[in-house]
């Protein structure tokens, strides 16, 4: 249950923080216009997408095409609009954050997920740059000490790489564990945040 009497109560409490409503989540973005752009950064190809309310996807990979297919799968009912010059500033801010994460990213988010996922994502946003937390520690912070696997699943479902810093979650012994954007990218991000690169 994630500590709320219902999903609606969680969404009411967090709508200003993470954005997308349950209806929009279930409808695959129906009625949404999502602007996106694909660029290159030091971690590879990066796709940044946003609704009028905020960033809804930051996807990182080796090639642009799989990133676009991922976005289309996430929002099959949305109108996707690419290559708009006025969106370049947003993309530049995200890339700047990837390159220098200690500077922070001051952009609104509009992400979709279950009440539990969104609760995990909010907890992740409270982990400062340069720090790490284990899946178990994060579950304990949520008041759910036995939910480490569920926390890992929520991290894997994170649609906004770096803005919701699931790369800051490590194994209990401090070693790196899986990262949907690639373990080497996770290592690079953590080193940057620690000031090692």
Model-based region annotation:
Residues 2-3, 8-146, 192-197:
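Basic nucleic-acid-binding alpha-helical/helix-turn surface characteristic of O6-alkylguanine DNA
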Residues 146-188:
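Short glycine/serine-rich loop segments
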